[in-house]
């Protein structure tokens, strides 16, 4: 797993995240035994505005050595709320990125973070978010009810969303996440993916679904699994 705070802002003497990934692919190309799958790695959470065309091209060319899965924190499907959050993109721009990723890497899985109950979030804003995540087709949503952080402008706002409303919205969005995860899993039925064996019982596929680990597979190994 390649992860870090603001991972997409990586810069080492002018070398960016795409350059780093190229170096890692080259450095690990032979780190596998005869008959074993090549070493692969997964990108941690990356901000939408940091996903470049060059990076997407590398992801498409890497043939699964960089997992075809990205976690892109959206936070809200309402452009109005995104402006209130001071996010540097709107819902339309995020959708364009998602469409570009799916066109460039057809089997890609997309997951995200959503904050519900940000100050001033209306029922309409929340419905926009629900509709948006359906359109994008995320395979998993990490749902967080907004909580105050003292000293921030949002914490001082008078239009705080009541706790019971935040809880209801979070529950509904988690149910929607489960529905979308099942739909994504079903769309992959009949395919084979390499899965990382996490424990004797559980493995994680390239598309970030948990599956039963094959009997006798060693923890830390990559094994092909048939998705059903």
Map each language-model feature to its residues.
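Generic alpha-helical structural signal
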Residues: 18, 22, 95, 127-130, ...
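Conserved SAM/AdoMet-binding glycine-rich loop
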Residues: 1-123
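Conserved, mostly hydrophobic/aromatic
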Residues: 2, 43, 72, 113, ...
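Terminal RNA-binding accessory module
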Residues: 145, 156-228
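Active-site lining segments that contact anionic ligands and/or coordinate catalytic metals
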Residues: 67-69, 105-111, 138, 190-192, ...
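Short, small-residue-rich loop/turn micro-motifs
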Residues: 4-6, 73-78, 145-150, 199, ...
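C-terminal, non-catalytic macromolecule-binding modules
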Residues: 123-124, 128-166
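Hydrophobic alpha-helical packing residues
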Residues: 24, 101, 133, 173-177
């Amino acid at each position: 797993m390649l992860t870090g705070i603001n991972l997409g802002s990586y810069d080492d003497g002018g070398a960016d995240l795409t350059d780093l990934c190229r170096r890692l692919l080259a450095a690990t190309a032979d780190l596998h035994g005869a008959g074993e799958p090549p070493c692969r790695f997964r990108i941690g959470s990356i901000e939408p505005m940091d996903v470049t065309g060059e990076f997407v091209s590398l992801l498409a060319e890497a043939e699964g050595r960089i997992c075809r899965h990205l976690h892109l924190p959206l936070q809200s499907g309402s452009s109005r709320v995104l402006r209130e959050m001071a996010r540097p993109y709107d819902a339309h721009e995020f959708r364009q990125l998602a469409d570009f990723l799916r066109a460039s890497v057809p089997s890609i899985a997309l997951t995200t973070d959503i904050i519900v109950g940000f100050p001033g979030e209306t029922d309409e804003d929340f419905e926009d978010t629900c509709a948006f995540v359906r359109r994008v087709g995320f395979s998993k949503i990490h749902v967080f009810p907004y909580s105050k952080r003292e000293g921030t402008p949002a914490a001082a706002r008078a239009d705080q969303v009541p706790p019971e409303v935040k809880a209801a919205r979070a529950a509904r969005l988690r149910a929607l996440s489960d529905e979308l995860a099942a739909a994504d899993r079903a769309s992959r039925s009949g395919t084979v993916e390499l899965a990382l064996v996490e424990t004797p019982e559980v493995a994680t596929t390239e598309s970030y679904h948990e599956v039963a680990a094959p009997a006798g597979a060693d923890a830390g190994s990559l094994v092909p699994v048939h998705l059903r």
